[in-house]
Structure formats: C-alpha cells, structure tokens
C-alpha cells in the first residue's frame, strides 16, 4: 500500500484490497485441520463452509475447478485437512481460506506411512522388474483371494464365466478390511501358494477410501505376494487407486474385472484360433494327398505289364537272330571273295597247275572247315542265347506254377494291399485264364 498522509482517509475497498494482498503474500499455502460446519454446495458448483475447532472457526471457499478432484463429499462435523491460502473476501471484509485441496483428517499421516513403506520395499528389491513373473496365457486353474461378501468377487466370477468357462476357479475367502485383515490376507496368500492348486492368483477388492484399502498397504501383504510361488495379479480398488500390493504384484490390473480379463483367455478367440488351425490342417492334408496321388499316377505309368515285357524280349531275340544270320552270311561272302582273289592271282601268275590245284584244294578244305567251325560256334551261341531267353520268358514262369493276377481294368496286381475280400480278379495260367473271387487277404509274414 503506498505511503499516505496519516490524516488522509482511504476508501474501504482499497483498505480491504491491501489487507487481502498482505495476507496472500504473508501466508503461503498451508495445511489447516478442523471440522466441517455450515457446508453448502452452490448452484455454480462452488463449496462454501466453515472450518472450526474447539477454539475458533474460519470461513472457507473451494471453487468447482478444485473440488471436483476431491474423492468424497464433506459432511457436517467431519474432520478434514485443507491446503489453503489465507485471504480476505473484499466485498464484505470477511477473513477466509481459499481451499486448493482437501483430504480426510489423518490421511496425511497415512500417506506419509505409505511413502515410507514404498521406499523401504523398493530398496529391498520387491518392486524390481526382474523379480516379476509372467502370467500364464492359458492357466489351467485360477485362484481368487478376497472376501466372499465383496462385490468385486461377483464381478470377477462373472467375467471368468463369460471369457473362460472351461477354467476351474478356487476362491480363498479372507476379510479385506478391518483389524487384522492384512495378516489374514498374507496368511491366505501363503496357503494358496503352498497348495499349488492354481496357475495364477487374483488378489482383489472393490473401491473405497484409503482407510478401506489400507490392508493392501501393509508390509505383511507385500512380503506374502513377493514370496508366492504362484504369479499374483492385483486388482484392488478403482483405476485411480494405487496400493503397495499393486507395486509388488507381478501384474497390476486397474480393477477386479480388469484382473479377471487379464488372466483369462478369451474363449471365443481360442475357438477362432482352433477353427483356423483346423482349416489350415485340412488344406495341408488335401495338398499332401493330391501330391501323393500324382506320384502314384507317375509310378503307374512307369510299371509295364507282363505282356509288354514278353513282347520286348521276343523282339530282342529276333534282333539277335538277325544279327547272327547276317554275321554268317558275311563270313561266307568274305571267304568266297578271298577264294576269287586267289584264283585271279593264280591265273595272273600262271603257277604250277598241280601245286596250285593242291593249294586250292587245301585252302578250300581249310576254308570249308573254318566256315563250318564258325557256323557251329554261332549256332551254339544262338542256342545259348535262345535258351537264356526261354528261361526268362513269362510263359516258362507260368509253366513253373506261377500265375499273373489282373484286376477288372487289366492292371497287374503286385501287393495284397491291392486286393479286397469279395473282389474278382483274372488269373493268367500257363495254358488258360481263370476268374477268381477273393475270399480273404493276408499279408506275407516271411517266405512263400
């Protein structure tokens, strides 16, 4: 306030403004404790009330932009703590508190205890990410640690029945608030872990005040979660509520329902995956069957009938016979040609007729003997080849007591697997054909 003449009068509004400025500058934001009195919610959404104790009271105002963050509605006589600035309502000259935040009395101590325990457990490594265990994607059984009277239990069971009705659920009943609740929760977690009935445990309860949720901020519960042999999912309170149990748990869900959704596989999704996998398997089997059928067709084209083999062998014998006859003719022609050459040479040289005649006679005999020997050797070779071919002929095989079986389409049958009881096959014997009805089929175990 600027300096003035002490005898000069100042307006009331200017005085009140100066006082308000001094108060706001002289008193920073301060926590004040007292009881609610004369609480009023204006149509604008602002709160007006008085804060009092046994010695005094002071008016308070909390504007809507601030009070919408308070998680409870103050009641007459309720003990609260407010964070406020001291100011003056200039229009009336009333001293008041401009409230920025509000909490129930005593919550400040609880919050400080919460922070101290959180720091202690963090230093002990209970919040370390490497300690967290993965939640099984398809649990065989699910455990729930909560109160039987909790609305959260009904929400969790409803969600599990909807998403995974095939998964059995075990409920471990325990009080979730009140004296001794924390130790009972810890004991039940130890029991559920020791029994190993479940693949995952849900620790849950519905929303409430910080006092209602305090059992989940106790050190005993934190250590029980940490030493559990079974993964623990916390679903405590609402999404904005955080407890020590949330930090220690392997996974924190925003709500009990969220915890149930997190641990349960969606049955519809699993059925869809199964159907798609089945369709893929059917397609794969069809492709494999088509491939094998194509391979069988290729093999069938390569298999020749006994008649075709017989015709091929006959053609080979005929070819060998032609070659043999040709070789004999060529030998005779060569010898005759040599004889003619000798005769020409004899005529040209006019040798001694008697000696020449003797030579000719001798050579003629040798030539005849050589031709005879050559003919005999070729004849013997032809006989051996013909005998070998005769042994290989299918007709000889049939004459030794064997038979060729053909199906109704004329295909040769090679395996008992191609026969069916009651079917009729055509048996080719050495000197005839017979139709045979198959009475039964038996695989060869060894030997004939």
Curated annotation (Swiss-Prot):
<comment type="subunit">
    <text>Heterooligomer composed of large and small subunits.</text>
</comment>
<dbReference type="GO" id="GO:0006308">
    <property type="term" value="P:DNA catabolic process"/>
</dbReference>
<dbReference type="Pfam" id="PF02601">
    <property type="entry name" value="Exonuc_VII_L"/>
</dbReference>
<dbReference type="GO" id="GO:0005737">
    <property type="term" value="C:cytoplasm"/>
</dbReference>
<keyword id="KW-0540">Nuclease</keyword>
<comment type="function">
    <text>Bidirectionally degrades single-stranded DNA into large acid-insoluble oligonucleotides, which are then degraded further into small acid-soluble oligonucleotides.</text>
</comment>
<dbReference type="GO" id="GO:0008855">
    <property type="term" value="F:exodeoxyribonuclease VII activity"/>
</dbReference>
<comment type="similarity">
    <text>Belongs to the XseA family.</text>
</comment>
<keyword id="KW-0963">Cytoplasm</keyword>
<dbReference type="Pfam" id="PF13742">
    <property type="entry name" value="tRNA_anti_2"/>
</dbReference>
<dbReference type="GO" id="GO:0009318">
    <property type="term" value="C:exodeoxyribonuclease VII complex"/>
</dbReference>
<dbReference type="InterPro" id="IPR003753">
    <property type="entry name" value="Exonuc_VII_L"/>
</dbReference>
<dbReference type="InterPro" id="IPR025824">
    <property type="entry name" value="OB-fold_nuc-bd_dom"/>
</dbReference>
<dbReference type="GO" id="GO:0003676">
    <property type="term" value="F:nucleic acid binding"/>
</dbReference>
<protein>
    <recommendedName>
        <fullName>Exodeoxyribonuclease 7 large subunit</fullName>
        <ecNumber>3.1.11.6</ecNumber>
    </recommendedName>
</protein>
<keyword id="KW-0269">Exonuclease</keyword>
<dbReference type="InterPro" id="IPR020579">
    <property type="entry name" value="Exonuc_VII_lsu_C"/>
</dbReference>
<keyword id="KW-0378">Hydrolase</keyword>
């Amino acid at each position: 306030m600027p300096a003035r003449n002490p005898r000069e009068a100042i307006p009331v509004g200017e005085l009140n403004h100066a006082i308000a400025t001094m108060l706001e500058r002289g008193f920073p934001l301060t926590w004040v404790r007292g009881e609610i009195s004369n609480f009023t919610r204006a149509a604008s959404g602002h709160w007006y009330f008085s804060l009092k104790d046994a010695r005094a009271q002071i008016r308070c105002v909390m504007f809507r932009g601030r009070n919408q963050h308070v998680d409870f509605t103050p009641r007459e006589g309720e003990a609260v703590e407010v964070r406020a600035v001291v100011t003056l309502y200039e229009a009336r000259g009333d001293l008041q508190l401009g409230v920025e935040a509000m909490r129930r009395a005593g919550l400040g101590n609880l919050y400080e205890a919460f922070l101290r325990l959180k720091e202690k457990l963090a230093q002990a490594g209970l919040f370390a990410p490497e300690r967290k265990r993965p939640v099984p994607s398809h649990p065989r059984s699910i455990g729930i640690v909560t109160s039987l009277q909790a609305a959260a239990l009904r929400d969790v069971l409803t969600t599990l029945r909807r998403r995974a009705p095939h998964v059995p659920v075990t409920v471990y009943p325990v009080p979730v608030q009140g004296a001794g609740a924390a130790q009972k929760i810890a004991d039940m977690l130890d029991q559920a872990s020791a029994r190993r009935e479940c693949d995952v445990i849900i620790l849950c309860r519905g929303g409430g005040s910080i006092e209602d949720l305090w059992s989940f901020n106790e050190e005993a519960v934190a250590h029980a979660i940490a030493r559990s042999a079974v993964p623990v999912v916390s679903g405590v309170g609402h999404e904005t509520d955080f407890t020590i149990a949330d930090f220690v748990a392997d996974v924190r869900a925003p709500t009990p329902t969220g915890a149930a959704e997190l641990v349960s596989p969606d049955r519809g999704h699993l059925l869809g995956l199964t159907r798609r996998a089945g369709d893929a398997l059917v397609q794969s089997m069809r492709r494999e069957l088509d491939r094998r059928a194509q391979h069988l067709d290729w093999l069938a084209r390569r298999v020749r009938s006994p008649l075709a083999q017989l015709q091929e062998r006959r053609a080979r014998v005929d070819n060998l016979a032609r070659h043999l006859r040709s070789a004999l003719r060529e030998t005779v022609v060569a010898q005759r040609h040599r004889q003619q050459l000798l005769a020409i040479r004899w005529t040209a040289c006019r040798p001694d007729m008697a000696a020449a005649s003797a030579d000719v006679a001798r050579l003629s005999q040798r030539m005849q003997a050589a031709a005879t020997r050559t003919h005999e050797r070729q004849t013997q070779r032809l006989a051996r080849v013909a005998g070998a071919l005769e042994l290989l002929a299918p007709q000889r095989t049939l004459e030794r007591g064997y038979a060729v079986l053909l199906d109704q389409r004329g295909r040769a049958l090679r395996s008992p697997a191609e026969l069916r009881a009651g079917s009729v096959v055509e048996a080719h014997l050495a000197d005839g054909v017979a139709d045979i009805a198959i009475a039964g089929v038996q695989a060869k175990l060894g030997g004939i």
